[in-house]
A protein has these predicted regions:
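Short hydrophobic/alpha-helical segments at membrane-entry points of transmembrane helices
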Residues: 23-24, 106-114
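Small-residue-rich segments within alpha-helical transmembrane domains of MFS-like 12-TM solute carriers
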Residues: 32, 36, 118-126, 156
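Extracytoplasmic
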Residues: 19-51, 129
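Small-residue hotspots at the loop-to-helix junctions and early N-terminal turns
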Residues: 46, 50-57, 145
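Cytoplasmic helix-loop-helix junction between adjacent transmembrane helices
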Residues: 113-149
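Short hydrophobic/small-residue motifs within alpha-helical transmembrane segments
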Residues: 63-65, 152-154
């Protein structure tokens, strides 16, 4: 069974390069939001799942296992499929998982959703890093640094917004 590997860097006009770059930056804000939201919501998730804090801590492990497996699978997926549609699918999956979290009433269901969330987050992480490199080629360094700064923006927004959501 043969597979096609997309060669990099791709050639785009300047306008398209910057539109794609802005989209990858926005994806990293979303990634920061989802990643940064777990800590502040931990006590609420434990209450919602009817378990103690020691049991709810499994969400960290399960989400990380999902992230690990999603990273491995995501790398192969971005090599074999058009990257932007895969990235869009991962963002949609991440959004669905985040929307399902408040609806889970048992720990096992929450762990399943967190596993999927971790895998989707990994797909966004791997995808944005890969695609940004393909768009900018050897000149990717400042864009890569900026993109990872946008992760921090999302994580900060998650911390700042949680107290307001509780009211």
């Amino acid at each position: 069974m043969s597979s096609t590997v997309i060669s990099a860097p791709l050639t785009f006009d300047r306008s398209k390069k910057y539109r794609l770059t802005a989209a990858y930056f926005a994806a990293f804000v979303a990634l920061g939001l989802t990643t940064g939201s777990l800590g502040p919501t931990l006590a609420s998730l434990a209450e919602q799942s009817h378990v103690g804090l020691s049991a709810i801590s499994y969400v960290f492990t399960v989400r990380s296992v999902g992230y690990l497996l999603g990273s491995v699978r995501g790398g192969k997926l971005f090599d074999r499929r058009p990257g932007n549609p895969v990235m869009a699918a991962m963002l949609i999956l991440m959004s669905i998982a985040m929307a399902l979290i408040p609806l889970t009433s048992t720990l096992w269901l929450l762990l399943l959703v967190m596993f999927v969330l971790g895998a989707a987050e990994a797909g966004v992480d791997v995808g944005a890093n890969t695609l940004l490199g393909w768009v900018h080629g050897n000149r990717v360094a400042p864009f890569m640094n900026a993109m990872h700064s946008f992760f921090g923006v999302g994580a900060l927004l998650a911390q700042l917004s949680w107290p307001r959501l509780q009211d």
